[in-house]
Structures are given as structure tokens and as C-alpha cells.
Amino acid sequence: MKKLHREICGPVGLVPTMGYLHEGHLSLVRASKKQDINTVASIFVNPTQFGPHEDFKKYPRDEKRDMAMLENTGVDYVFVPSVEDMYPAGFDSWVEPGILQQCLEGAVRPGHFRGVCTVVAKLFTIIRPDRAYFGQKDYQQYLIIKRMASDLNLDVSVEMLPIIRENDGLALSSRNTYLSPAERQAALVLYRSLLTARSLFDEKEHRAEVIRKKMTDVIQHESMAEIDYVSLSHQDTLCESDEVSAKTIALVAARFGKTRLIDNMFLA
């Protein structure tokens, strides 16, 4: 990367990924291509953001496929470090996020965001991008990384792009490959619950308890869904309140068989 820094002229955009790319990732690459002279994608399945009983070992990997997709999308550079590159022997320094990690994904997956922030901070330090691009599907992650970059005076603009969905509304995710046909059909209930929340808000329903109950009912109507959380949170703080507003984001997480999926939607 040091040699690369000497060669690169102009703004650098970074698209950090864990590989097994889909159209959501490629939309981030295209956004960088529009804004930055140089676009770098990274591929690294980060072990420190997985819990002891999560899917690190079986997380889908296909580097050859990913490289072809990135080349076709016009990425300029691809950074594919090894675990030893990112976490050499004796590594013992971590980036610990604050209050934003205490709810939602952070509550269900202890230590997850410590791993995320540490690896992203290292990527920012190694690649030194002007902009970094993240998808809305991992909204809490986006907020935490944006706060980290600000708090640590990292000279990078953290950008968020909208969720990319299948035609039937399922949010694109590398983990969708785990789903059986029946589970995939069942997973559409997450999108339906979010549409329910937005519809109620559009109809002037502002009581969070009422909207959350309706969302929960929609998901529980699907017998294959096991809810982790249904949340109506302020989009800047992730705090819940009794009344929703134009600044509220609805977030859901559920398991379908052994596959855990998340999704979200702004109410306005």
C-alpha cells in the first residue's frame, strides 16, 4: 500500500467488504466511481466481529468471483489482506465504540462493533481514503463508524447509500445464500413489517407502541420467523421514544432457520 500511495493522485474512495459481493456492494463501488478518481475495494472476512457461535467459518467466500465482479464494475484497486496482515502475532489494541453500540446489534452480538471499528480504523489507516462507502442495511454500523471517524479525527468522509432490494423487497445480503426456498419466502416478512410501519406513520399514527405492536404482529404471523428485535429509534441516536417522527428509523432483526437477517427503513 505504501507504493500505491506514491502512485495515486486525486481523491480515493474506499468500499470495505467481507466479500461474496452482490449488487448492494457494487452500488457502493459505482457511487465511488462517480465521486472519486480512485476507487479501492477491500475484501476481508474479519474474524473479530464474529461471536463464538456465529458463522465466521461458513461465511460465503469466492474471491475469484468477487474479483471478476469488481473488475467489471471498474474498481481501480482491490485490497485483500490476510488475517495475519490485519492481526499479527501479539496484536492487542482495539477501538471500543461508545453508547451507540449498546442497543440493537450491539446488545444481541456483544463485541461485534469492537471488531468492526478496529478493522475499519485499520483499513482507514492503511488505505487513507477521502471517502468510505457503507450501505444503509447495516445502519447502526454506519452510525458507529461515522462517530468513530469524527471522534478520532480520521480524515475521511463516511458516506451511506440506500438499501438495494430484490424485486420482491428482500434486502440484499451475502447471508441470503444460506436461506432455503421456504426460508427466503418467509424472510419477506421483514420488509412487510417495515412497510407496515411506514404506512401507519403516513396515516398519522405517531404512537411508537402501536406501530411496534403492528410490526411485531406482522413478523410473528410467519411461523418460521424468530424475532431478535423490533425497534423504532431516532435516526441520529438510536434512542427509542414514545412518539415517532420524521426522524425515526424502523429496524428489525429475525432468524429464519439458522440464518439471521436485519433490515430497516426510514419512516419519512
From Swiss-Prot:
Its EC number is 6.3.2.1. Gene3D superfamilies: HUPs (3.40.50.620), Pantoate-beta-alanine ligase, C-terminal domain (3.30.1300.10). GO terms for molecular function: ATP binding; pantoate-beta-alanine ligase activity. It comes from the Bacteria. GO terms for biological process: pantothenate biosynthetic process. GO terms for cellular component: cytosol. InterPro entries: Pantoate_ligase (IPR003721), Pantoate_ligase_C (IPR042176), Rossmann-like_a/b/a_fold (IPR014729). This is Pantothenate synthetase. It comes from Dehalococcoides mccartyi (strain CBDB1). The gene is panC.
